[in-house]
Amino acid sequence: MIPSDHFVRFYNEIFKFLENKGHEHLEDYFLTISRHQETHCLKQFSEGGLQGMYDYWMVIKKEENCDSDKFIEDGQYGKVLKSFMSGCPSLGKVQDNDAGACPLYCYHCPGWILPIMSKVGYYYVYDLISLDMPRCQATICEHIEDARAQLKMVLNRHKGDRSLVKWNFPEED
């Protein structure tokens, strides 16, 4: 088995290669990752809902040594799972080498997660914060109105810069 230090650096080089061929190649790769991830989490997410998602990511937190906090709370319309990553080990490892990070490295997380959230019927707002800091925030909502309120807040924080925010639902009906 390849050590995670090598894996994330290899991933990074694949991302750079594909982006160099054209952004659509990188997007297609993220969708391929998403399809493969379904075997690991689709059933748990669809049957366990937000608690199943929380349980899945708590295992990942331990396995990957993530500096993150997650909690489920009440939104205005339904339950919401919030995630705050204050130390992403994956991006940290990619930055800690002389090859340089793919400028879009962080996009792989929403790239695989958003399609799965759509399949299980949850609304996802992913705030990348900055592409060169190993930090991000995510909110997963049962109800679209909670997600729209979160999206509005995140877009306001980024002064309308949509490049650092990813979501899987229409902003308006």
Residue spans for each PLM region:
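N-terminal accessory segment detector
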Residues: 1-107, 118, 123-173
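ATP phosphate-binding glycine-rich loop and adjacent ATP-lid/helix-beta elements
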Residues: 108-109, 113
